[in-house]
Amino acid sequence: MTLFCEQVPYPRLAEAFGTPLYVYSQSALTEAFEHYQTAFAELSPLVCYAVKANGNLSIIKHFASLGSGFDIVSGGELARVLAAGGDAAKTIFSGVGKSEAEIEFALNAGVKCFNMESIPEIDRIQKVAARLGKTASVSLRVNPDVDAKTHPYISTGLKANKFGIAYADALEAYRHAAQQPNLKIIGIDCHIGSQLTDLSPLVEACERILILVDALAAEGIVLEHLDLGGGVGIVYQDEDVPDLGAYAQAVQKLIGTRRLKLILEPGRSLVGNAGALLTRVEFVKYGEEKNFVMVDAAMNDLMRPALYDAYHHIEAVEPKNIAPLTANIVGPICETGDFLGKDRTIACEEGDLLLIRSAGAYGASMASNYNARNRAAEVLVDGNEYRLIRRRETLEQQMANELACL
């Protein structure tokens, strides 16, 4: 049976736009966002989509139409939010290395809040705000030293990580921020990692942060919001992912009677399973020790398998009644690490379409031009309709900034 995205068969999309091709389901995006709104309804959260997961303008625009706020980590991401019609007043500026130019851009745009991550950043935002004659609304990202139990590259809440202000130093950092005339402290933030499959670290982080909220209140620093970041995982293979309803109930119980607005910053859990990467088999190569299915997608299109040894389910779009083989599914890039799946049993042959699932997050957003390969096109499907939301890059576009310098 042929695979479909909503009501559109994948072969139709391949014929119209070629491969490799990122394909997103609009209904899946909507359902994921509304799942957060429903689960946390009692707390009336501001759900801020983490743009780093997938910064396509049409995806940002769709979330904006649903009432989403946005979590950004660069001036470029802010520019994307604004270009797509997102609301700066519902945008949180996170990130460990904000430049003065980025801070100025964000202040002039009117972002809701800066999540500050160090004493030098506090001083820098004060300096820029004073120069502009503005007041910057700020919170501090506090590192609660909680083990997120995830891949070390995407764990962000331990003492050894570069993110946030150490828990033991947080009170003093808040005192320092409170002395700055052009800063208005409105919140506290934590984010302990990505692709979390266990609820307990999220709850533990919330508990530790609320202890700090109370200590700050005792010193007269009363906060308006609690930002718990993102991190909730999705199913790539057979993971047990946290139940949002249970998470919401735990957070509500912990907040209790405190008058705190809740902010959440999901990324992967909004877009990850809404997208897939469509690719075509170039060759099937049989070897003495290993077989290989060579496809036209590669690590420059989807970096996660090579970077994290991440698993993505891969299946034939139009299954055939032929003998399956066990093989590594690999791209044409000149790296041994250019693989999309290892030791997969699949029935396919030259020219067949394969679908790489759960590629909506950290797929296109991490793509590159390695080996001078053009970045893939992207398509958004809505029912039986579909539209191109990113044209396939051309070699002329890829070389434009260099040709001008010859």
From Swiss-Prot:
Keywords linked to the UniProt accession: Amino-acid biosynthesis, Decarboxylase, Lyase, Lysine biosynthesis, Pyridoxal phosphate
InterPro entries named in the record: Ala_racemase/Decarboxylase_C (IPR009006), DAP_deCOOHase_LysA (IPR002986), De-COase2_C (IPR022643), De-COase2_CS (IPR022657), De-COase2_N (IPR022644), Orn/DAP/Arg_de-COase (IPR000183), PLP-binding_barrel (IPR029066)
Known cofactor(s): pyridoxal 5'-phosphate
One GO molecular-function entry: diaminopimelate decarboxylase activity
Residues the record marks as active site: C334 (proton donor)
GO biological process: lysine biosynthetic process via diaminopimelate
E.C. code: 4.1.1.20
Record-linked Gene3D superfamilies: Alanine racemase (3.20.20.10), Lyase, Ornithine Decarboxylase, Chain A, domain 1 (2.40.37.10)
Residues that hold pyridoxal 5'-phosphate according to the record: G231, E265, P266, G267, R268, Y362
Chemical reaction(s) catalysed: meso-2,6-diaminopimelate + H(+) = L-lysine + CO2
List of residues that carry N6-(pyridoxal phosphate)lysine: K52
Binding site for substrate: R268, R304, Y308, E335, Y362
Pathway noted in the entry: Amino-acid biosynthesis; L-lysine biosynthesis via DAP pathway; L-lysine from DL-2,6-diaminopimelate: step 1/1
Assembly behavior: Homodimer.
Biological role: Specifically catalyzes the decarboxylation of meso-diaminopimelate (meso-DAP) to L-lysine.
Matching NCBIfam families: lysA
Family: Belongs to the Orn/Lys/Arg decarboxylase class-II family. LysA subfamily.
UniProt protein name: Diaminopimelate decarboxylase
Classification of source organism: Bacteria, Pseudomonadati, Pseudomonadota, Betaproteobacteria, Neisseriales
